[in-house]
Regions:
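Long, low-complexity, Lys/Arg-enriched
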Residues: 1-87, 101-341, 353, 370, ...
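Short glycine-rich phosphate-binding loop at a beta-alpha junction
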Residues: 87-93
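C-terminal structured interaction module
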Residues: 92, 98-101
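Short beta->alpha connector loops
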Residues: 7-12, 95-97, 363-364
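Conserved catalytic cores of phosphodiester-cleaving nucleases, focusing on short active-site segments
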Residues: 296, 346-348, 353-361
Length: 444
């Protein structure tokens, strides 16, 4: 089978026909020069297709003049004639206006041409032609993993799921999931296990204090054991402005088996349960990120999707295929290239739709909105969903809350508020709603 794809600025539009119909050959039609296509677009496309198992696919590119309807028609006629004997399939989701008009004119002349279009949510593919009375819906599903979506957009994953800190990444065994739920409950309800509007803020204060202690001796032999001078611990932590708060939380952490604290005459010893718990108790926003990830991953798994957390993205990929210019740290060292990177709290895909989720357990500014918007549009052009999951916005943002919320809405970012007051099912329902997830298919 030969298919024709109208080459588009949105990379997802360029691979729908390939994923749907598994052709032997694809012909891209577009306004880019052949040189630009082969040097800038094709390497990224081939790397993606190789990963998807299409390394043997025959790829051809036909350049048309964007301003010449005659040239467009001639090129389409040539493609049709040269592939006579083959079914002529054209995927029309992408493409420029005049090229689409040309294709319409060709379809009028050649009513046997089958056209395909995927819906705006990338879930439904319909086939139609002038020789048929009506179009038909095809039972075809296309999917990308998180990594495949980034490859398609010229990027790569530097690290994910905590593998920059832990060999093999986070260990989401039953014990760690239990600890996440315990810590999340403390973050949302406070050390007294009671609902409090300022509980997330209290959590942030205590974890920042623990982070300060954790950073004092980074080369210590036992990373989970902190040794602090007793007098200094008393003056700086126990009798400081947040001393009572810190003491209450440490006592509660002990009761929940998250850490142990031993006070001696000369030193105070804080021993974390394990390295993953230590990370959660010394990085203020991590517990919200991991809790949201577990809920989101469950939603994705039930829909054959993909979900990663703590994803660091290299914008132009391992081989710099997406770069146009590379600047150097050291002008005398050609290998000292500068890579643009971003970390996204949670990246997910369902079908072909990518989701970019940022988790905020405290104060943030409109700059964070623009960062999320930029990264989402860069690696999900036209189709990405951008979401911010938050705890106590009233306390964190104060009078600026509605200004930031309005700005988020204006640039297409969904915000889920006050998740610390909600059950897992309520959070999942809100995620399903803003992500516009399809219903789970059930076997009859």
């Amino acid at each position: 089978m030969t298919i024709v794809e109208l080459f588009d600025e949105k990379p997802i539009n360029n691979i729908v026909g390939i994923l749907a119909f598994n052709p032997d050959k694809v012909i891209y039609v577009g306004g880019y020069t052949r040189k630009h296509f082969e040097s800038k677009k094709l390497p990224i496309l081939k790397k993606y297709l190789d990963r998807k198992g299409y390394s043997a696919l025959d790829i051809e590119y036909v350049q048309v003049r964007r301003d010449s309807f005659k040239d467009i028609m001639e090129k389409f006629e040539n493609i049709y004639s040269s592939d006579s004997g083959c079914v002529f399939h054209v995927e029309v989701t992408g493409g420029e206006d005049l090229i689409l008009i040309g294709l319409g004119a060709l379809s009028q002349r050649r009513p046997d041409i089958e056209l395909y279009q995927i819906s705006s949510k990338l879930r439904t593919i319909r086939s139609f032609s002038l020789s048929a009375d009506d179009g038909r819906k095809l039972d075809i599903e296309c999917r990308n993993t998180v990594e495949e979506n980034l490859l398609l957009h010229g990027a790569s994953i530097i690290s994910a799921n905590g593998d920059e800190t832990f060999p093999g990444g986070y260990r989401f065994d039953a014990d760690f999931v239990h600890d996440i739920n315990v810590m999340w409950d403390i973050c949302g309800r406070g050390s007294k296990n009671m609902v409090s509007p300022s509980a997330p803020n209290s959590w942030n204060k205590v974890t920042i204090m623990l982070a300060s202690l954790n950073a004092e001796d980074p080369d210590r032999e036992n990373q989970n054991l902190l040794c602090i001078d007793a007098q200094r611990f008393k003056e700086e932590y126990m009798t400081s402005i947040n001393g009572t708060l810190f003491y209450d939380y440490i006592c509660y952490f002990i009761r929940c088996d998250l850490l142990d604290c031993r006070i001696e005459s000369e030193h105070v010893y804080i021993n974390f349960k394990n390295d993953q718990v230590r990370m959660c108790l010394t990085k203020a926003g991590l517990i919200l990120e991991l809790k949201t990830y577990l809920i989101c991953k469950k939603l994705m798994d039930s829909r054959d999707g993909d979900c990663l957390t703590s994803v660091t993205i290299d914008w132009d990929g391992d081989e710099n295929l997406a770069s146009t210019i590379k600047y150097l740290y050291n002008l005398d060292d050609p290998d000292s290239t500068i890579d643009t990177t971003n970390e996204i709290d949670i990246l997910a895909t369902c079908g072909l739709i990518p989701y970019f989720i940022s988790c905020k357990n405290g104060k943030f500014t409109s700059e964070e909105l623009y960062k999320l918007y930029l990264v989402g549009e860069q690696f999900g052009k036209g189709y990405c969903q951008k979401i911010i999951v938050t705890t106590d916005l009233n306390h964190a943002l104060g009078d600026a809350k509605n200004v930031i919320l309005q700005r988020a809405v204006d640039i297409g970012i969904q915000i889920i508020e006050d998740v610390h007051k909600k059950t897992d099912d309520e959070i999942a329902d809100e995620l399903k709603k803003v992500m516009e997830l399809p219903k789970i298919k059930t076997c009859v």
